[in-house]
Amino acid sequence: MAYSYSEKKRIRKSFGKRPQVLNVPYLLTIQLDSYEKFIHRDLDGQQGLEAAFRSVFPIVSNNGSTELQYVSYELGEPVFDVRECQIRGTTYAAPLRVKLRLVAFDREAAAGTVKDIKEQNVYMGEIPLMTDNGTFVINGTERVIVSQLHRSPGVFFDSDKGKTHSSGKVLYNARIIPYRGSWLDFEFDPKDNLYARIDRRRKLPATIILRALGYTTEEILTMFFEKVLFEIQDNKLLMILVPERLRGETAAFDIEANGKIYVERGRRITARHIRTLEKDGITQIEVPVEYIVGKVAAKDYVDLSTGELVCPANTEISMDMLAKLSQAGYKELEVLFTNDLDHGPYISETLRVDSTYDRLSALVEIYRMMRPGEPPTKEAAEALFDNMFFSADRYDLSAVGRMKFNRSLNIPEGVGTGILTNDDITGVMKKLIEIRNGRGEVDDIDHLGNRRIRSVGEMAENQFRIGLVRVERAVRERLSLGDLDGITPQDLINAKPISAAVKEFFGSSQLSQFMDQNNPLSEVTHKRRISALGPGGLTRERAGFEVRDVHPTHYGRLCPIETPEGPNIGLINSLSVYARTNNYGFLETPFHKVVNGQVTEEIEYLSAIEEGNYVVAQANSNLDEHFRFTDTYVTCRGEHGESGLYKPEDIHYMDISTQQVVSVAAALIPFLEHDDANRALMGANMQRQAVPTLRADKPLVGTGMEKPIALDSGVAIVAKRGGIIQRVDASRIVVKVNEDETIPGEAGIDIYNLIKYTRSNQNTCINQIPCVNLGEPVARGEILADGPSTDLGELALGQNIRVAFMPWNGYNFEDSMLVSERVVQEDRFTTIHIQELSCVARDTKLGAEEITADIPNVGESALSKLDESGIVYVGAEVKGGDILVGKVTPKGETQLTPEEKLLRAIFGEKASDVKDSSLRVPNGTSGTVIDVQVFTRDSVEKDKRALEIEEMQLREAKKDLTEELEILEAGLFTRVRNLLIESGVSEVNLNNVAREKWLEQTLDDEAKQNQLEQLAEQHEELCKEFERKLEIKRNKIIQGDDLAPGVLKVVKVYLAVRRQIQPGDKMAGRHGNKGVISKINPVEDMPYDENGEPVEIVLNPLGVPSRMNIGQILETHLGLAARGIGDQINAMIKQQQEVTKLREYIQKAYDLGHGSQVVDLSTFTDEEVMRLAQNLRKGLPLATPVFDGAHEAEIKGLLELGGLPTSGQITLFDGRTGEKFERPVTVGYMYMLKLNHLVDDKMHARSTGSYSLVTQQPLGGKAQFGGQRFGEMEVWALEAYGAAYTLQEMLTVKSDDVNGRTKMYKNIVDGTHQMEPGMPESFNVLLKEIRALGIDMELDED
C-alpha cells in the first residue's frame, strides 16, 4: 500500500485478517443528504420545499375568479456566518423568497379568460441552514435534529396475541396508516364480527364502510363469499359438488352417487374421499332437504308474480321459505359457502349487526360517529366521507405507503395513487378475513421493513407545509372578499405563520436537541442517532419489550450494543457503520454478491425487506485465495433471519466487513468480541462522555476506526486540495495548491483559520493545533490541524496509562482506583473547561440599569480587576465571589430615617437610590478570564470598553484580510515574475522595480501579453475584493446588536477553568470498566517493577470476572507489547544505531501476525524511517478490528519482540517497603478516559438555603443549593443504635421544625447551646391530609 507523506509519520499496525473492501462511508451523510434534498430545488416536485409549495399552490378563491400560483423559490445568502451567529446568539439562516403569480379571470367572458396577471417575489421568512458538520445554529447554540424511526405508512395486519379477551381468543386486526390523514382500522371482536374504526374512535360494523362505498348487501356477499348452488328437481334437492370444499367436514348424511356410498354419515371427509369423488367425476349429489335449512341466501329472491321479497339476501333459509321459493318457480338456489374451519361467515354475521340499509344511512352513521351532536345533512355526510380517504388534500399514503400497501396486497408496483380506492379497502378486508381463516400471516411491526427513518429534511418539509397550510386559509379568505384592485401577492401573504412553524420545529421540537459536544465521538454519534420517540412516534411509558428488543433485521442497520441505559433503552439507537437510508427511508446495508460459492467484488445494498429472501454468509467465513468458501457448510442467516448451516452454492450474499453490525462508538472498542454485551453497552456510552485532555494521546491499542471518525467529525482541519505548506502558525495555515488542482485564473492559495480556545456546548474547550510543518507536502483530504481529542488525525479520547491489576490496601475496593501522583504532575488528565457568564442590563420601571465601576458599599480591593467601564479585564485570575461586571439597579424610594437623611446630605445622592446587582463568579469556581464580549442596543451609546473591543476586532479583521491579500498577491506576483522571466526580462531589472510596475510591462509575445493582462485584472479584482470584504466586516462589527426587548446591554465573560484529576472524579476504560478515584498516591509509594518503573493506576482484579469484560485484560497485554516495542525503538535511537537496523526491527514488528495489512518500509527514505521511529518511541500503535482482532499467538509474539514475558505478568515490588509482592501481577497499558462527571461539579456545601414551601424541608440538589436527605434507612440506623437525641434533632430542628430551628439559631447567636424541638411541619401536612379525608384528629398536650 502506498502511503502519503503525512500517513508515513505514524502507521497503525492492523491485525485484521479481512482486507477492507469498502472504506467507511462519510459518517454524517444521513444528516447532510437529507437537508440538501429539502433545500435544493427538485424540478420533479417530489421532495423538499418544491413539493411543499406544489402541494398547497395554486390557491383558488371560493368563486374561482382569482388564483394565486407558485412559480419558483430562491434562498438568499445568510447575513452572518456560523461563527458570528454563535457569538451574537442569532440563528444561522437564509431568507426565502418565492416568486408568486396572482391571476384574475374575467367572469363575464368564456371560462379561463385571463383578465390580469401580477407576478412578484414574496419574502416567506428565514430557513435555518445546516453547517458543514450537520448541525444547526439556533439562537447561538449548536443543535442537532435527530432522525426518527417511525412506523412506515401502508397497511399492517396484526393480532392481539390473545391478550384482549379473557377467553384468550386471538383477535386479528388491520390498520391502514397514511403519511397524512385519517387512520382506518378493521378488527374482529370476540364474536367474530368485523368492525371498523376511523382515527381510533368508536367502532362501527365494517360493512357500514362498504355500504358507504356504494355496495349493496348482495354485492358485498358476492365479493366476500364463494357460492354453493342447489337445484330443485322433482321434489329432490341436488347440490352442485365442488369436492375440495368438503375436506375436513363431517358428513351429515350418506354421500352417495350412482348407487355407491362414498362417505358414510358421521364420518370425517378426508383427502382420500375427495380424490375418489374427483376420479369418478361426481359433479352433483342429492342432499336431504334439512341440509339447506340454516344456510344463508346469497341474493334477494323475489316472487316475480306478486313482487313480494320472499327471501332477502343474507337470510337463513327455513322450510317455509323453501316452500315459498319452490312455489315462486325457482329451480336454483345460491347460498353462501361457509364452514367452521377455513371459510368463516364473518361478513354475513356482521351484516346482521349492521343497522344501515343503504349508502345514505351508512354515511349518516359515519357522520354521527365523527361529529357527534351535529345534525347530519346528505351533502355534509358525503363531503366528510369523501374528504376522509379520497381527497388528495386531506389524505396521502405517500410513495412509501403506496409501495408497502401494494406489496402487502400483491398489487403490481406502480398501480394506484396517494389516495385509497374501493378496491384498496375491500382488498384489506379480504386479506384480514383470509388471515382469520388461517391463510396468511400477521406482520411483524418491529421488522425494519415496517419501520422507516424520517430525517431532518423530511421533518422540516412537514413543518414548512403546516405553516403554508395556515397561510393558505388566510389567503383564500382574502381572495374571496373580492375588491382585489391594486393588490399584489405580497399583500396577500403573511410570512409569520411559516416562520413560526419552522422556528418552533428547530427551537423546541422533541427531536431538535442541544448537541452533545463533549468530544468528536459524541458529536458524530449524536448526528447518527435514531430515535423512536418524538412527535408521531412512541412514548417511553407505552413502549413495551418487543419494540425495544434487538430484532434480526437490525443486523448491519442499527447497532445492537449502543443504546442508553434507563427508561430509553432500545428506543434510542445508533446507525451501524455502513448503514444508509434508501429513497423510501428504509435502512440498507452493503453485501458482497456471491455466485456459485464464489464471492464477487460486486457490492449491493439491501433493505431489510429484500434481505429476508436471501441466504447471507458472515464476514468472517473462511475463504481461499480465489475468494471461494472453503468449508463444506457455512454458518449463514437464512430466510426470516434465522441462522443455520448452508452449502456454499446456496449462498446469495456475504457481509462486507466484520464491523458492519456495530455502530461507530462500539467499533472503537478493541476486543469487543471478548466483552459481555452489557459492559460493551456501557463502554460505548462512556466514550461519549470523555473530556478532551490537555494533550491528546492516541490509543496504543485501537481498532482502526479512529481515523475516519476524527476526519468526519469536522473538529480537525482537512485539506480541501493538495499542495505545499507555505505558512503555518498557531492560528492560520496557508497551503500553496498543486498546479494540477488549481482553477485557471485563481491565485492557487488556500487559507485555513484555526479555532482557538472556544467553548463547546458542554463547556469543554475546543482548540485546534497545527500538525504540519513548513514546506511539507499535503494531499487532498489529509489532516492539517488537530482539534480537541485528536492526535495526528486520529481520535484520542483519553490517555495510555500503565495499569496493574492488584488489590492495594483497600483503596481499589468496589471499583475505586488508586492513581499515582505522577499522572497529576504530568497533566495527563488535566482538562480545560470554559464557562460563559453573562450580565444583562435592562430597562426597569424605575429607570435603566447601568454597567459601571461605581458600585455602592464595595471596597477598592473588590474592584481591582475591573476597568473604568466596570468590566473585568482579559487575563484576570478570579475566584468565587469576585465581581466580573459591575452593575447597579435603581431601587424604589423609601421613607428615610433622620440618620439616613444626614448621611445622604453628607455623602450625596448616589449612595442610596441604587442597589448592587453585579455579576459575580459563582461560588466554588475559579479561573482566568479569556474573553469579554459587549453587545449594545442600537439606540444606546457604547461605553469605552465596547469601543475598545470594537477597535480591536476591526484591527484583527483588517490584519487577517491584509495577510490574506498579501499571501494571494505573493502567489500572483510569483506567477507574473515567472512569466516575465520566460519572456526575457532579467531578474536584476525585476528586483529593482516595484512589484506593481511588473504588471505594466508590455511583452512581444501576444499570448504572454494576454496572460499578463489577465493577471493584472486578477490583481485589481483582488484589491477590490479586499476593500469589499473589509467594508462588510466593518459594518458587521460597528452595527448595533439585536437584543431582546427591554435589554440595553449584554456583557459576556468567558472563564477558563483548569481542572486536574482528583479523588472523586470518575474514570473509565473502553470496556464498561468504570470507577472513581479514591486516592492520589505519591509516586514513591506505588508498586514498581524490577527496572524501577512505577505503575500509574492500580485497578481491582475482582472487577473483571463477574463483569465478564475480558477485553480489558487483552488490551492491557497488547498495550504492554506495543509499549515494549516503543521502548526498544527508543533505546535504538538513543544508542544512535544505524537506520538499517531500525528499519529491520520496525519491519519485523509490522510483519508479525497474519493480518492482511502490508507495510513495506523499503519504499521509505532513511529520513522517513527516522521520522516514523521518532513517532513510535512511546509505543507502536496497533489496530485490532472488532470481531477480527489479534489472536493469542500474535499477542505473545509481540510481547516477545518487545522483550517482555509472554504471560503478560511482571514481578512487582511494594513502593513503601521495597518488598516483592508474593506473585506476578498483570501489568500493561490501558487506554483510560476521564469522564465528564467531575467531583467539582457535583460537590457543594449548604449553609442557609431555601426551603420547600409546603413541607418546610430543605430542597435537594446542587442547583437549588440543597441539603443531604436523611432518608428512612438512615433513620433505621440511628434507631438501631438507640441514638434518640441525634435522631430527634435530625427530624426536627435540622429539618422542618420551623420554630425550633429559628430558636436554635437565636440560641447559637446568644451563646446558649440549647434546643427545644417542636412539631415538624411535615407532621402538620399529614394532619391536613387526614382532615382532607374528613377525619378530624386533635393533638392532646400532656
Curated annotation (Swiss-Prot):
Entry GO CC: DNA-directed RNA polymerase complex
Any one GO BP annotation for this protein: DNA-templated transcription
PROSITE patterns listed in its UniProt record: RNA_POL_BETA
Catalytic activity: RNA(n) + a ribonucleoside 5'-triphosphate = RNA(n+1) + diphosphate
Gene3D superfamilies: 2.40.50.100, 2.40.50.150, 3.90.1100.10, 6.10.140.1670, DNA-directed RNA polymerase, beta subunit, external 1 domain, DNA-directed RNA polymerase, subunit 2, domain 6, RNA polymerase alpha subunit dimerisation domain
Uppermost EC category: transferase
Keyword Signal on entry: no
MF terms in GO: DNA binding; DNA-directed RNA polymerase activity; ribonucleoside binding
Pfam families, per the entry: RNA_pol_Rpb2_1 (PF04563), RNA_pol_Rpb2_2 (PF04561), RNA_pol_Rpb2_3 (PF04565), RNA_pol_Rpb2_45 (PF10385), RNA_pol_Rpb2_6 (PF00562), RNA_pol_Rpb2_7 (PF04560)
Family: Belongs to the RNA polymerase beta chain family.
Protein purpose: DNA-dependent RNA polymerase catalyzes the transcription of DNA into RNA using the four ribonucleoside triphosphates as substrates.
Assembly behavior: The RNAP catalytic core consists of 2 alpha, 1 beta, 1 beta' and 1 omega subunit. When a sigma factor is associated with the core the holoenzyme is formed, which can initiate transcription.
Name the UniProt record assigns to this protein: DNA-directed RNA polymerase subunit beta
Organism of derivation: Haemophilus ducreyi (strain 35000HP / ATCC 700724)
Organism taxonomic ancestry: Bacteria, Pseudomonadati, Pseudomonadota, Gammaproteobacteria, Pasteurellales
